[in-house]
Amino acid sequence: MAGNLYLVSTPIGNLEDITFRAVRTLQECDLIAAEDTRHTALLLQRYDIRKPLESFHAFNEHSKVEKLISRIKEGLNVALVSDAGTPAVADPGFLPLRAALEAGLEPVVIPGVSAVTV
């Protein structure tokens, strides 16, 4: 049974501006693919989330997207996060989103705080 790709929105500035659903998703996933692992590590540390963390950014996404999709097809639940905001909007993430859709997967978007309200 295939896992899921979760596009998890992260805080824009204040680490406390994250939704309960986003924290739960990060806690329950098998792997977190992050635009900047150092930046994301601070968020994970703040919420005591201990999951494998891999870099997935504009400079390596072309070489990593197939493996990421294969892992999801094998049953892993993968959370994709950017440094701030929603992946695939103005950040890396479009490529894995498109690849997931082409593979017949149904990515799940975990919305967050809007820049308009921050």
What are these regions (language model features)?
Residues 49, 61, 73-77:
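Generic short alpha-helical segment signal, independent of protein family or function
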Residues 37, 62, 113-116:
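Amphipathic alpha-helical transducer elements in NTP-driven molecular machines
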Residues 60-69:
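Glycine-rich, highly charged phosphate/nucleotide-binding loops
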Residues 17, 63, 91:
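Residues that form or flank phosphate/diphosphate-binding pockets in enzymes
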Residues 1-59:
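Glycine-rich, flexible N-terminal cofactor/catalytic loop recognition
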Residues 73-118:
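Short glycine-cluster motifs
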Residues 21-23, 46-49, 68-70, 92-97:
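Short, glycine/charged-enriched secondary-structure capping and boundary segments
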